[in-house]
Amino acid sequence: MILVVGLGNIGVEYENTRHNVGFMLIDLLLKESNFTNLTNSKFKGELFKIGSSLLLLKPSTYMNNSGLSVKAVNDFYKCERMIVIHDDIDINLGALRFKKGGSSGGHNGLKSIDTLCGNDYERVRIGVGKGENVISHVLGKFKSEEEITLSKVLEHTKKALLELIENDDLSAISSKYSLKA
C-alpha cells in the first residue's frame, strides 16, 4: 500500500491558501479518478482509496498535528511507502522539488509527521515563496496573478506524482520533473 498525504488546514478560511497546496493536489487527483471514500473518525482526516494499493489522505487535524492522522492511517494499513505533498517557503512559486528524508525545514506539518512516524518518506515540495511575514504569507490566499502559475505547477506535479507512484525512482522523477522559478 502507498500512502500519499496532502498537507493543509481544514476550514473555508484556509481554502486556496499557500499552506493548502497539498490538499489542492489531492483534490486534483480525486477529480480525475474513481475512488472509494474510506473516511472514518479514527483516521482523523479524509481518506480515499484508488485501485487496490493507493491511499490519498487529507489530515483534518490542522497542519501542526498532521502526524496524528498520518500515524493512524499508516498504523492501520501498514503502508510500504509514504509520499507527502507540502508547501515550501524556501523555494519560489512555480518551483517544484523532490526529496527523501532529512529535516522538516521548519515546516510544522512535517515536524509532526517526523515526530510520530519518522522522516524516511518521500516529499513533494511545492514552492510558495517567502513573504515578509511567514505566517501571514503561508496562511494567505494566492493573488490572482499567481493562480495561473499555481494551476500549471499543480498539473505538472500531478504528472510527476503519478509517475513516482508507478516507478518508485525519486532520483529519476526529480531529474525529469523538478522546476526552477
UniProtKB/Swiss-Prot annotation:
EC number: 3.1.1.29
Location of this chain's protein in the cell: Cytoplasm
PROSITE patterns referenced in this protein's UniProt entry, alphabetically: PEPT_TRNA_HYDROL_1, PEPT_TRNA_HYDROL_2
TM region positions: none
GO molecular function per UniProt: peptidyl-tRNA hydrolase activity; tRNA binding
Keyword Zinc among UniProt keywords: no
Catalytic machinery residues: H19
GO annotation (BP), single: rescue of stalled ribosome
GO cellular component: cytoplasm
Role played: Hydrolyzes ribosome-free peptidyl-tRNAs (with 1 or more amino acids incorporated), which drop off the ribosome during protein synthesis, or as a result of ribosome stalling.
NCBIfam families from the UniProt entry: pth
Subunit structure, as described in the record: Monomer.
Protein family according to the UniProt entry: Belongs to the PTH family.
Protein name in UniProt: Peptidyl-tRNA hydrolase
Gene coding for it: pth
